């Protein structure tokens, strides 16, 4: 043996040196362990499980993804939370449905959720519950490209939704049908959007146009659209008015009607596809105070009292959010469910999942997994009382 290129040493000397080095290392390790914080076993309860490629259902794949990481894990967890909602008794499930998803082929998924009562209330942009009518009329949308020459599309009367094309003539035909339907409504009655869309949905059912609001009306599922005029409905309201048939919308009555839902349920679960007005409207149900229950709270509900204000709030027990927006810009679409806890809108002990993903990817996968996984028929709450005045 040679140490540091010096004179050879005997094996016994080499062993002694190595033994000394080992003792020094062991002593250093003991000192490190004594001075370092102990790592709790709770950090290591659930191992990440690698996904094996084999034939499997969507439900099984998402179950395996929930045991991995990043947004794949969150997508799998979203299925778990939704499944728990469906299986819980005395729960109202509200979906906030933002953007222009119907033009992207998502509207029949919403119909299925309504028919099977995996949602009890839909809060939607006007776009989602109007642009689906084009497709339901048999007209449809077409795959295009976002590299289009938009000036040429304008000349050809083609409307572009990112990589989807729609005919302007089809849109006008939808608006005409919508106007005809709205002109069957009473001129002297102040409608909420839920009442209006219920009556209009019945009209579409008679026309065999199986859109979202038609399906909802057939199953007594309320559809609220707080910003309904920001869509083809706004155009249809104007056209009806110009033909001597003005429609009255009462947004204060609408909000009071929505808040009253919280007085007739034990717990609430929410699913947000995107954010915007639909999300905020549904979130307000947790904290909005009705004069009817201001002093003593809602009987039968586990409310929390803001002692300084002497007001009750009722955080949503379950929550799912599918979004591509980020929280640091301050907008509601990217606002985390954890931030909503500070407002009293989301239950600190409830089940929740946030997945940052394009909804056209997440929604079909989640709903197909639910279809495979949940075998019980849900006993859904009866919300037909909301339509009592217009039935």
What do the PLM-derived regions correspond to, one by one?
Residues 79-92, 215, 260-267:
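Glycine-rich phosphate/diphosphate-binding loops that line cofactor/substrate pockets in enzymes
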Residues 111-173:
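A generic, well-ordered mixed alpha/beta core segment in the N-terminal half of proteins
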Residues 105-108, 133-139, 234-239, 282-285, ...:
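Short acidic, glycine/serine/threonine-rich loops at helix termini
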Residues 152-233:
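Ligand-binding beta-strand-loop-alpha-helix segment within the catalytic cores
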Residues 39-86:
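N-terminal glycine-rich anion-binding loop in soluble enzyme alpha/beta folds
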Residues 93-102, 122, 224-228, 246-332:
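Glycine-rich anion-binding loop/nest that anchors nucleotide
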Residues 297-391:
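C-terminal functional extensions of proteins
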């Amino acid at each position: 043996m040679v140490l540091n290129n010096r004179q050879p040493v005997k094996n016994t000397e080499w062993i002694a040196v190595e033994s000394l080095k080992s003792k020094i290392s062991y002593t250093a390790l003991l000192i490190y362990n004594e001075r370092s914080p102990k790592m709790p076993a709770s950090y290591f309860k659930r191992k990440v499980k690698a996904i094996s490629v084999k034939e499997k259902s969507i439900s099984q794949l998402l179950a395996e993804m929930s045991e991995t990481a990043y947004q794949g894990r969150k997508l799998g967890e979203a299925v778990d939370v939704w499944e728990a909602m469906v299986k819980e008794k005395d729960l109202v499930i509200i979906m906030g449905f933002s953007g222009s998803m119907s033009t992207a082929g998502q509207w029949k998924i919403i119909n299925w959720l309504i028919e099977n009562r995996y949602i009890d209330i839909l809060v939607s942009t006007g776009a989602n519950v109007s642009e689906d009518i084009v497709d339901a009329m048999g007209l449809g949308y077409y795959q295009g490209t976002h590299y289009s020459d938009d000036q040429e599309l304008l000349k050809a009367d083609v409307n572009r939704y990112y990589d989807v094309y729609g005919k302007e003539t089809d849109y006008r035909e939808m608006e005409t049908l919508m106007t005809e339907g709205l002109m069957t409504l009473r001129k002297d009655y102040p409608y909420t959007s839920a009442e209006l869309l219920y009556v209009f949905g019945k009209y579409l059912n008679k026309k065999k146009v199986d859109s979202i609001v038609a399906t909802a009306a057939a199953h007594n599922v309320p559809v609220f659209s707080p910003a309904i005029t920001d869509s083809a409905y706004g155009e249809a309201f104007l056209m009806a008015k110009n033909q001597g048939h003005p429609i009255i919308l009462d947004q204060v009555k609408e909000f009071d009607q929505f808040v009253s839902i919280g007085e007739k349920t034990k717990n609430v679960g929410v699913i947000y596809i995107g954010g915007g007005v639909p999300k905020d409207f549904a979130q307000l149900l947790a904290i909005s105070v009705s004069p009817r229950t201001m002093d003593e709270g809602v009987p039968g509900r586990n409310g929390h009292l803001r002692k300084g204000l002497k007001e009750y709030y009722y955080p949503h027990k379950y929550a799912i959010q599918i979004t591509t927006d980020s929280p640091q810009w301050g907008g509601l679409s990217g606002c985390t469910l954890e931030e909503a806890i500070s407002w009293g809108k989301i239950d600190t002990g409830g089940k929740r999942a946030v997945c940052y993903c394009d909804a056209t990817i997440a929604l079909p996968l989640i709903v197909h997994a639910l279809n495979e996984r949940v075998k019980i028929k849900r006993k859904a709450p009866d919300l037909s009382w909301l339509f009592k005045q217009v039935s």
